[in-house]
């Protein structure tokens, strides 16, 4: 068997240098899979390679907004796996927060490019490998903000709605190729995006790791969850036909309630979220 994979199952992960992607890479490695880890964070990738062992992974810088980067990454991955891909985890994402008009237009467009257009690109580029692999799966990171449009992260939330809709459509389309498609809708996950997402309206100072863990909710559907909880969800998804995965599972109730009582959900969002920013014009 050609390449480093040597017949092992293989997963291609974007946003693999940190957070949910890194946790997933480590879990699948522990399960005996060959891991393709891709990110713009080269230092993070190099430290991941040291953890996994170079014989067990392929690391490569990948700008998900550049289709040629994706094509080159897919070709390099195929060389190591004999043209197979058991699972695509299209996970890279960024955020912007603040009132809609405070977020620079260019920054909003970049959120769309990274969070949605790059997912589309990943699927176009990965599909030939997925089709060539029995029981293959494309798994995509959506968000709890795809259950209802969320104020102050409006464009981010819209991209995650788009991901959810794409997942639903392609889960039907790709079935004719024997390829499954599903997504994960994480809530509050302990990753760098919580600390690094700019607040363009300026009323939320940056928080440290310690402050985040002290002040974040400890219970309820929006309690702070470790990145490993999403990795475990990705692992469970590979052996399942479930379409949407919620982390924690209670977030799924928002989807249920939105269908049954959309006005109630909207009223609750206005009541609970907007007062948090009442001092901001």
Predicted regions located by residue number:
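Active-site helix of classical SDR
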Residues: 123, 159
């Amino acid at each position: 068997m050609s390449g480093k994979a040597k017949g092992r199952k293989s997963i291609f992960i974007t946003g693999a240098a940190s957070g949910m992607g890194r946790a997933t890479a480590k879990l699948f490695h522990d399960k005996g899979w060959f891991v393709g880890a891709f990110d713009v964070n080269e230092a993070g990738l190099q430290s991941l390679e040291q953890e996994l062992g170079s014989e067990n992974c392929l690391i490569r810088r990948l700008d998900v907004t550049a289709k040629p980067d994706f094509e080159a990454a897919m070709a390099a991955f195929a060389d190591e796996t004999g043209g197979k891909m058991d699972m695509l985890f299209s996970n890279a994402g960024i955020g912007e927060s603040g009132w809609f008009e405070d977020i620079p237009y260019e920054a909003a467009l970049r959120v769309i490019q990274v969070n949605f257009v790059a997912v589309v690109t990943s699927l176009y580029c990965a599909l030939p490998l997925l089709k060539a692999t029995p029981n293959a799966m494309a798994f995509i990171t959506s968000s709890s903000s795809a259950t209802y449009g969320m104020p102050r992260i409006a464009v981010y939330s819209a991209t995650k709605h788009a991901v959810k809709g794409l997942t639903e459509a392609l889960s039907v389309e790709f079935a004719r190729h024997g390829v499954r498609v599903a997504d994960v809708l994480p809530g509050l996950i302990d990753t760098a995006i919580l600390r690094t997402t700019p607040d363009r309206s300026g009323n939320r100072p940056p928080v440290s790791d310690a402050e985040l863990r002290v002040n974040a909710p400890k219970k309820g559907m929006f309690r702070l969850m470790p990145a490993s909880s999403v990795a475990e969800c990705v692992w469970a998804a590979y052996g399942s036909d479930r379409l949407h995965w919620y982390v924690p599972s209670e977030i799924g109730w928002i989807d249920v309630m939105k269908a049954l009582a959309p006005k109630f959900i909207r009223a609750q969002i206005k009541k609970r979220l907007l007062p948090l920013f009442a001092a901001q014009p």
